[in-house]
């Protein structure tokens, strides 16, 4: 394996206690990338979740965890892995001491599964989920497929391991080791190493890969147990437990020997795993039936073993006598750098040769005159002490919470309370009088007349009256079709800022979904579309008359729901944006039915009405009913988002295999819609008789033949229409990002979830 980002450390400068013979230690060339994001994660936890007390995580005076356990990590990925690993350490401490550890694991699992499958994490207004959304967003922006693989692996880790049996009293070594192989995070390590090194294990080799790596996973678990024994023992005592879920305790009890003797038994087991795994790696290197990436993964794990050992021997997390180095203490006291150092000049490349410009880091603290971001000051024991931060606003306009006496005074604008179940066991004693907050805000707040599926309001529950079944049927059908729920996700993301009370938020989702589904019913009928989400369109099943009647009925039903807000302004917003939807659709239909090609400006005016109207509707309702003391106009952002959303849809309709599967090949051309690529083609080739005649034939036949659609698509490529659309998407994406940044500064809160939604749309 080629080593590009790490160097071998002089063995005379570190200790191994004789437990890693034959495996050198390698250290990443830019460990400060990890340090910055590790401290940032701690600050985010203080701000979003609660105080850390005497917590210590992945930093060490000489060696940081990720820098020596994944030394060949691609530089642009080291920061986010350091951030994610710090969350893992925090989560580990939570499940050690929490009364409901499995609930926290279930929550972690659900969040990562959602991020991997939909790009959305529900309930992102809660602290932990906001942190997870940030991780997912950063990873997706680097490499979507590697990120999805890692998020799925971490979800599996949360499901099977992650301390789920910390309270189990294991009786035998074999029983415990079987559990520990899962709990050490087979899937967690797999996710870290593969994402960090840009590795893609072939699906057919995955089972074999893990089987070959089992010995390494066992080593990692045993090493962790050996050096974390004292910490876990003290935690068990503090929690009034008479046992410790650690190999040392299990050996002592099963063999009836002393602690010192049990540790020696553990050391011998560790030595054996080193010998065995070195042989496995050497044997695998010689095989020609194993992929290069599987070999790279196993060799990467080899250095994880030496790194994990050396870090464990002197890290502050396991050893109270160990402190931090000067740079770390300086950053803890005076603030971390505003931006991480540039990696490899002006850009970095991932394993696939994709270049990424260095990103400006998230501003999670106040800026001083030295381009620093203030984090809570920390003493040599890792405990926060009084800081001079006074919740001031930094250069980016983000307001941050003051820190005092080891606790985070949570920003009142967030209206979030400290969850003492998520606080280190030693700090819990100091905060036992503080009330916790709900794990999922908005849970257990069902509004009358709605059905919730995975937290998203999907349909109105009809009364038992038989007379309504007929008029309800078309709506129920369209509501039952699979949906990505982008609007629900966007509402959840905006609520990070707006803090709309749960009952009102559910009402906004219900109204939005009603209007969205009715618009789909009418659009498919008016456009002559026979497919919706890969299924038959509503009007092809229920007929045009019933579909129109049901759609109109549910517009009235939506208005009834708006009345429940109890104020006139909500009704005004509803009527204004509903009118916009109809005006936008009228322009689209007029251009299509009369074969009139609009200008680009006219097209975007139509989009702001037809697509942007629904986004503005829920955005304006959320602003009106926001409990946040800061008020901001979301209209500009939502208009830009609507433009981006529709332009992306235009492009995907012509180029995406998934769209072809769901709606048919180039369906927009069948319908005669003037999408942005077609508008560009018409205006860039006004004298092209092929284009004009094909479009005339489409009007005559009310559809375009597959051959005609293919011809139009080829002309779009030749005339640069698809490239023009891609360029437009880049510009619109930048404008949406700028709007998000402006709103983050206005509200004083980073919106990781909204950025994740935008990134998923860009990558899809």
From Swiss-Prot:
It comes from Aspergillus flavipes. The gene is tndC. GO terms for molecular function: lyase activity; metal ion binding; prenyltransferase activity. This is Bifunctional type I diterpene synthase tndC. A motif (DDXXD 2) lies at residues 523-527. In the N-terminal section; belongs to the terpene synthase family. In the C-terminal section; belongs to the FPP/GGPP synthase family. Residues 377-403 are annotated as: Disordered. Dimethylallyl diphosphate binds at residues 532, 610-611, 646, 653, 663, 673. Mg(2+) 1 binds at residues 92, 96.
């Amino acid at each position: 394996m080629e080593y590009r980002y790490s160097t071998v450390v002089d063995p005379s400068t570190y200790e191994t206690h004789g437990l890693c013979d034959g495996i050198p230690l390698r250290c990443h060339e830019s460990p400060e990338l990890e340090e910055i994001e590790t401290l940032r994660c701690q600050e985010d936890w203080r701000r979003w979740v609660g105080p850390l007390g005497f917590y210590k995580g992945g930093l060490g005076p000489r060696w940081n965890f990720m820098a020596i356990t994944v030394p060949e990590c691609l530089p642009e990925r080291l920061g986010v892995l350091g951030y994610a690993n710090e969350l893992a350490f925090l989560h580990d401490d939570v499940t050690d001491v929490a009364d409901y550890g499995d609930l926290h694991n279930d929550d972690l699992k659900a969040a990562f599964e959602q991020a991997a499958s939909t790009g959305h994490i529900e309930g992102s207004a809660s602290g932990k989920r906001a942190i997870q959304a940030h991780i997912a967003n950063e990873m997706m922006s680097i490499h979507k497929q590697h990120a999805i693989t890692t998020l799925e692996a971490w979800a599996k880790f949360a499901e099977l391991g992650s301390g789920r049996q910390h309270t189990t009293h294991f009786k035998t070594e074999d029983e415990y080791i079987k559990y520990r192989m899962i709990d050490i995070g087979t899937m967690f390590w797999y996710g870290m190493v593969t994402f960090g090194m840009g590795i893609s294990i072939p699906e057919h080799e995955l089972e074999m890969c893990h089987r070959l790596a089992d010995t390494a996973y066992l080593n990692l678990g045993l090493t962790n147990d050996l050096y974390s024994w004292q910490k876990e023992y003290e935690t068990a005592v503090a929690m009034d437990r008479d046992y410790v879920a650690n190999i040392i305790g299990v050996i002592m009890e099963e063999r009836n020997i002393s602690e010192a003797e049990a540790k020696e038994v553990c050391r011998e087991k560790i030595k054996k795993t080193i010998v065995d795994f070195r042989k496995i790696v050497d044997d695998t290197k010689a095989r020609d039936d194993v992929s290069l990436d599987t070999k790279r993964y196993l060799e990467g794990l080899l250095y994880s073993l030496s790194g994990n050992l050396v870090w464990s021997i002197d890290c502050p997390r396991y050893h109270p006598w160990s402190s931090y180095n000067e740079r770390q203490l300086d950053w803890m006291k005076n603030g971390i750098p505003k931006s991480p150092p540039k990696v490899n000049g002006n850009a970095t490349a991932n394993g696939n040769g994709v270049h990424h410009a260095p990103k400006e880091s998230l501003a999670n603290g106040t800026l001083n005159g030295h381009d620093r971001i203030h984090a809570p000051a920390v003493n040599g024991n890792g405990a926060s002490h009084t800081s001079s931060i006074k919740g001031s606003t930094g250069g980016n306009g983000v307001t941050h919470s003051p820190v005092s006496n080891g606790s985070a005074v949570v920003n009142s604008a967030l209206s979030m309370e400290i969850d003492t179940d998520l606080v280190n066991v030693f700090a819990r004693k100091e905060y036992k009088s503080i009330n916790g907050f709900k794990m999922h805000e908005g849970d257990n707040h069902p509004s009358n007349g709605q059905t919730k599926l995975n937290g998203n309001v999907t349909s109105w529950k009809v009364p038992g009256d038989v007379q309504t079944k007929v008029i309800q049927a078309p709506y129920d059908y369209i509501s039952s079709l699979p949906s990505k729920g982008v609007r629900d996700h966007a509402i959840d993301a905006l609520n990070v800022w707006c803090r709309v009370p749960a009952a009102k938020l559910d009402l906004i989702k219900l109204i939005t979904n009603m209007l969205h589904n009715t618009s789909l019913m009418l659009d498919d009928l008016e456009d002559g579309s026979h497919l919706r989400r890969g299924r038959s369109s509503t009007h092809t099943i229920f007929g045009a008359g019933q579909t129109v009647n049901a759609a109109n009925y549910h517009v009235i039903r939506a208005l009834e729901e708006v009345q429940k807000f109890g104020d006139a302004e909500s009704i005004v917003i509803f009527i204004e944006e509903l009118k916009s939807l109809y005006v936008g659709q009228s322009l689209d239909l007029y251009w299509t039915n009369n074969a009139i090609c609009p200008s680009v400006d006219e097209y975007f005016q139509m989009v702001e009405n037809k697509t942007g109207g629904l986004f503005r509707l829920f955005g304006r309702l959320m602003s009106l009913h926001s409990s946040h003391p800061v008020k901001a106009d979301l209209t500009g952002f939502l208009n830009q988002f609507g433009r981006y959303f529709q332009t992306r849809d235009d492009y995907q309709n012509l180029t995406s295999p998934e769209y072809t599967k769901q709606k048919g090949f180039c369906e927009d051309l069948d319908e005669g819609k003037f999408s942005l690529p077609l508008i560009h083609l018409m205006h860039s080739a006004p004298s092209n008789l092929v284009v004009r005649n094909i479009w005339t034939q489409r009007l005559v036949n009310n559809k375009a033949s597959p051959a005609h659609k293919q011809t139009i698509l080829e002309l779009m490529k030749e005339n640069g229409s698809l490239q023009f659309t891609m360029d437009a998407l880049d510009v619109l994406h930048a404008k949406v990002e700028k709007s998000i940044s402006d709103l983050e500064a206005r509200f004083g809160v980073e919106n990781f979830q909204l950025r994740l939604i935008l990134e998923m749309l860009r990558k899809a």
